[in-house]
């Protein structure tokens, strides 16, 4: 049973509240806290000029602003501090303010604490956004008012009083959001786990432990969904306190969701045929299986099938940009890890011209070479990691005699131009970087949009 939001309203009134980060999720949060009568100070590395209208709007509402390089120096003397998701709880300034007696929390934690509706929480290394979107589409098709939040959708805490107990909430949750989560999800879904974000986590174990928080606080009334074919997530079963349901793309599961001979099943009943699913690739079959077993008690097989046969995917995920002179250009900018790029490559029915490389998250690229080479016709590399990726393909050539032609470029424009020159009629060109974007772009969406802009100008 979740807590009554009145408790939070009474608690926050007249409190001195620090909000770290004036980003997408925190702007509505700050406005909401003002409305609830809190005395708010907002902290951000950006300057007043960079924030523009946002800073003048907040100042007019009585928000104190601490901005610029040393913006966290004055994070002291607060009753409550809302941290930004990427901020580690063991960061010096948070440890200090906590010692002073401040209650340190986040928008997502407070939302889960007070939300009346049934919550589906989705995490994993790959497939989170697509699975979250599929689940929300199926719940909508069934007739539920559905709210989507977390990493995608809109910040929901500011809308908490509008959400009714009969509604459904679907949250995409990152390892950063889960690191401090100690509240139960009604349905927790873990799509898969592979090394990721090792630039932000101390090691792989810390990353796994963060993901586990999606189910560790559940009880017997809650449900955990695990991928039978992913060793790490299947291992979660032993620690689960609620019902565990499984999905598999490789074996029959009497009580789960599974794929066999071109058909997706739920508890032995056919839901749909793989060839009729609009978004291609076995990774999307797995996303659908996870969604089917997660929504088993809320959505009819008929509505599951309807969504699978009509939903055409999420932007920046194997997204067809255009076809020019018989060459198809795909934007898979979301692929910020080697496993994600591999899944994208396997979705195509031929070898492709791959544009890869970017910010270094300290991931190993050997799997991209060893498992990816049969799917790559030409490899175009750019960004911080281009030498690291080139080295693993050169090692493949030295050890197994398998040679992939590699071109190195400095910009995305050069990469697209090079790909266009290499391509012949019938070829596929895909931007699937296997890396984050931060060396050249603020995020994967801006990278993907830049790619689309370049392709559309060809």
From Swiss-Prot:
Pathway: Cell wall biogenesis; peptidoglycan biosynthesis. ATP binds at residues 124-130. Its EC number is 6.3.2.9. InterPro entries: Mur-like_cat_sf, Mur_ligase_C, Mur_ligase_C_dom_sf, Mur_ligase_cen, MurD. Pfam families: Mur_ligase_C (PF02875), Mur_ligase_M (PF08245). Its main location: cytoplasm. Keywords: ATP-binding, Cell cycle, Cell division, Cell shape, Cell wall biogenesis/degradation, Cytoplasm, Ligase, Nucleotide-binding, Peptidoglycan synthesis. One of its GO terms (biological process) is regulation of cell shape. GO terms for molecular function: ATP binding; UDP-N-acetylmuramoylalanine-D-glutamate ligase activity. It is an enzyme of class 6 (ligase). It is found in: Cytoplasm. It catalyses: UDP-N-acetyl-alpha-D-muramoyl-L-alanine + D-glutamate + ATP = UDP-N-acetyl-alpha-D-muramoyl-L-alanyl-D-glutamate + ADP + phosphate + H(+). Gene3D superfamilies: Mur ligase, C-terminal domain (3.90.190.20), Mur-like, catalytic domain (3.40.1190.10), NAD(P)-binding Rossmann-like Domain (3.40.50.720). One of its GO terms (cellular component) is cytoplasm. NCBIfam families: murD. Belongs to the MurCDEF family. Cell wall formation. Catalyzes the addition of glutamate to the nucleotide precursor UDP-N-acetylmuramoyl-L-alanine (UMA). This is UDP-N-acetylmuramoylalanine--D-glutamate ligase. It comes from Clostridium botulinum (strain Eklund 17B / Type B).
